[in-house]
Amino acid sequence: MAAVKFLVCSVLLVVLATQSEIGLAQNCSAAIGGLMSCGPYVLPGNQLTPSTQCCSAIQAVNHGCLCETINIISSLPGHCSLPPVSCGTA
């Protein structure tokens, strides 16, 4: 469990460090940092309901910031010479 939390923190730090626009990175940095309260909810196999803190953090994040962050995370395998991740396909 600690290793997964470390991985989540590491990914978030990489995402924040690689934002292409400084203004967006500064605005997203605090908002994305707030998403750490959602950590237990995003782990595979959990049966938890998101906490009030998590829901508040999600509400505070700009839609563009979320999309940009998801795009950056999705590109990580390619930057590590790994095949792309394809969710929902066999």
Curated annotation (Swiss-Prot):
GO terms for cellular component: extracellular region
Residues making up the signal peptide according to the UniProt record: 1-26
Species this protein is from: Lilium longiflorum (Trumpet lily)
Record-given protein name: Protein LIM3
Keywords: Disulfide bond, Secreted, Signal
InterPro entries: Bifun_inhib/LTP/seed_sf, Bifunc_inhib/LTP/seed_store, NsLTP-like
Subcellular location: Secreted
Family, similarity comment: Belongs to the A9/FIL1 family.
Predominant location: secreted
Matches recorded under CDD domains: nsLTP_like
Highest classification ranks of the organism: Eukaryota, Viridiplantae, Streptophyta, Embryophyta, Tracheophyta
Disulfide bonds: C28-C65, C38-C54, C55-C80, C67-C87
